[in-house]
Amino acid sequence: MAGHKIAHATLKGPSVVKELVIGLTLGLAAGGLWKMHHWNEQRKTRVFYDLLERGEIGVVVTEE
């Protein structure tokens, strides 16, 4: 019988360009999520102080 050729995966070193693209993509995604979180917190703070300034809410507990 003739020898069968089996395709084996050849191991290569890390691809620098691929690593940079993956790192950049993950970094931008994480940064975008962080900025969205930060903007949401800023909005909550701004709404709180607007309500406080208009007198609709108070931070002092009224005693009865």
UniProtKB/Swiss-Prot annotation:
Main subcellular localisation: mitochondrion
Cell location: Mitochondrion inner membrane
Cysteine disulfide partners in this protein: none
Transmembrane segments: 15-34
Keywords (A to Z) from UniProt: Membrane, Mitochondrion, Mitochondrion inner membrane, Transmembrane, Transmembrane helix
Superkingdom of this protein's organism: Eukaryota
CC per GO annotation: mitochondrial inner membrane
Role played: This protein is one of the nuclear-coded polypeptide chains of cytochrome c oxidase, the terminal oxidase in mitochondrial electron transport.
Family recorded in the similarity comment: Belongs to the cytochrome c oxidase subunit 5C family.
Protein name: Probable cytochrome c oxidase subunit 5C-3
Lineage: Eukaryota, Viridiplantae, Streptophyta, Embryophyta, Tracheophyta
